[in-house]
Amino acid sequence: MTIAEIQQEILRMKKEQDICILAHAYQGQEILEVADYTGDSYGLSVQASKRDCSGVIMCGVRFMAETCKVLSPEKRVWLANPVAGCPMAEQLDLEGLRELKAQYPDYAVVAYINTTSELKTECDVCVTSSSAVEICKKLEQDKILFIPDPNLGHYVAEKLPEKTFAFYKGGCPRHIVVSAKDVEKARAAHPDALFLVHPECRQEVVEQADYVGSTTGIMEFAKKSEHKEFIIGTENSIVEHLQFECPDKKFYPVAVQLTCMNMKVTTLMDIYNCLKGQGGEEIFLPKNIMEGAGRCIHRMVELGG
């Protein structure tokens, strides 16, 4: 079958089965075209509970599918490709978190959504890159242990100088490879371009940005801006998607190595096979995980909404 034929079959089967397809913005264009909703982690979290359907196929990584299941326990949820995991979500385990909590006993524990559901059971609230500042500001506690991404944590801390932060030494393996030198090279090559960056990048990179925001924030800024050229400091799929949606503008990756292969493992055939009952992985979580992670995730939606 051609790509177009596979897409048509997916559209037909998802309608027949009352299935909603959610796709993270880092997925390929051919996947976004069959999705009912595309966006960043926060948008996917909200849509998971809002969508009126009997089942959800998540085209993203494991923690996203788990978050979807926690927010929609009555729905069947599948991860389109079972091997799609997030390295950052796996950097800190429960034992490591408990050791950190012992070091900072009077700190509120704020988890980036890029964490396992098990880890979320022992956190006060989780956040996304688009909601982190707002949620941390609303917390009653003045001391915050931010896990696992110190880059996003430092960005939030700069916005909230009235609060004290402690961090874990984690981070996104892709975003942290971007250096200030990469930015300098990109600006030299494209002197008229604005630099838009994700806060998962290192401080030295974020400090040079014309705009700092989540994946959705970056895309919305670029679409609405009167400017015509942009250097994009996040996963390189966003360059592709923005160029597709804004053909009158020019978009350049800040670094060629900013490609998340974990997101790229999901294919159209994964979705097709999942709908056929021949692929994907249905998500099941123990009751204690559903309840503990649910408390953390629902508080995120409550404070960030």
Where are the language model's segments positioned?
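Active-site loop-to-helix "anion-binding N-cap" substructures in soluble metabolic enzymes
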Residues: 1-232, 238-305
